[in-house]
UniProtKB/Swiss-Prot annotation:
Pfam families in alphabetical order: Sod_Cu
Biological process terms in GO annotation: removal of superoxide radicals
Cofactor note: Binds 1 copper ion per subunit. Binds 1 zinc ion per subunit.
Annotated protein name in UniProt: Superoxide dismutase [Cu-Zn] 2
Purpose: Destroys radicals which are normally produced within the cells and which are toxic to biological systems.
Domain of life: Bacteria
Keywords: Antioxidant, Copper, Disulfide bond, Metal-binding, Oxidoreductase, Signal, Zinc
Cofactor: Cu cation; Zn(2+)
Binding locations of Zn(2+): H85, H93, H102, D105
Catalysis performed (reactions): 2 superoxide + 2 H(+) = H2O2 + O2
SUPFAM superfamilies listed in its UniProt record: Cu,Zn superoxide dismutase-like
SS bond list: C74-C167
Length: 171
């Protein structure tokens, strides 16, 4: 039993060491009507930024594009104020594009039959460390955006993902 407790304690120590407790952020997501529909917690890890997303009021049973956009501004109803995908290295769009991806490109998310999503996504291309080229805390900020359709992971500039239906400024 002592051996098991020691292994468990050591495992927990390793897991907690992979997260930087000082580097966290959050975003409150709104829909095109300006209503709060969810939240995201962002945590710096040794492998990138872990994004824990919890939202409701999205299209049911849908595959939706989920990106980080280059401006920390979410003006409904179009959210065009968030500008394009966060792309500090000037790459092409898409996780499947040999000349990509943008730092803000992430896997699609999936909603349940009620339009809810609860997911954790690790983005290895970004950081919460201020002053870094790929920092989400750059001048002008950044935002999380959910689109009305799936990202095809290759079409430039945005993966044919459809309209922007939710947005949250990363703080």
């Amino acid at each position: 039993m002592k051996k098991l407790s020691g292994v468990l304690a050591g495992s927990l120590l390793l897991i907690s060491a992979s997260f930087s407790q000082d580097l966290k952020a959050h975003a409150e997501l709104i829909n095109t009507e300006g209503e709060v529909i969810g939240k995201a917690e962002l945590i710096e890890t040794n492998s990138g930024v872990l994004i824990k997303l919890n939202a409701k009021g999205l299209p049911p049973n849908a595959e939706l594009a989920f990106h980080i956009h280059e401006r920390g501004e979410c003006k409904p109803p179009t959210f065009k104020s968030a500008k394009g995908h966060f792309n500090p290295y000037g790459k092409k769009h898409g996780l499947l594009n040999p000349e990509g991806p943008h730092a803000g490109d992430m896997p699609n998310i999936y909603t349940d039959d009620k339009g809810n999503v609860r997911v954790q996504v690790l983005n290895p291309f970004v950081t919460l460390k201020k002053g870094e080229k790929n920092s989400l805390f750059k001048e002008g900020g950044t935002a999380l955006v959910i689109h009305s359709g799936p990202d095809d992971y290759k079409s430039d500039p945005a993966g044919n993902a459809g309209k922007r239906i939710a947005c949250g400024v990363i703080r």
